[in-house]
Amino acid sequence: MDQNKLNRVLESMKETGIEQLLISDPASINYLTGRYVNCMERMQVLYLDVEGNHKFVIGKLFPQPEMGVEVIYFDDTEDCVAKLASYMRKGTKIGVDKIWPAKFLLRLMELGVGTEYIMLHLSLIISVRSRVQKNRT
């Protein structure tokens, strides 16, 4: 995991009030981890938490080498969203990248993890931080 890039994203999350972020876009995951993974219709998500409890959740069919974040595997018979939810904090605002399939988001909402869900793109959260910094000067 690129610590400088991660720190920029975490700062942006704090400034925008997003405590947890779900990133499923392979290009965005690659940007932060240096690993390009595309599981097609299966869930893959990089979970970022302002408290530092980061996870990469992916199917067992796609084993990952060390990437600087704990990798959590699920198999095709498990409820992958429930597994992800078990690591998330309840009662916070959650940022969800714009390409995460609705079937996963709806299941997460059904599990009652977040109080609010904000659809965004990683580049948007980084650009919000840039605008905030410019306004401070």
Language-model regions, residue ranges each:
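A short, polar/proline- and glycine-enriched secondary-structure boundary/capping micro-motif
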Residues: 7, 64-71, 106
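Flexible, acidic/His-enriched mid-domain "rim/lid" segments that flank
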Residues: 3-7, 81-137
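Short, polar loop motifs at secondary-structure junctions
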Residues: 56-64, 99-106
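Short, hydrophobic beta-strand segments that form beta-sheet elements in well-ordered domains
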Residues: 21-23, 53-59, 93-97
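Terminal domain-start leader segments
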Residues: 1-53, 89
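Short acidic-hydrophobic, aromatic-tinged amphipathic segments that line or gate anion-handling sites
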Residues: 70-81, 118
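Short, glycine/acidic-enriched capping/hinge loops at junctions between secondary-structure elements
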Residues: 32-36, 57-60, 67-69
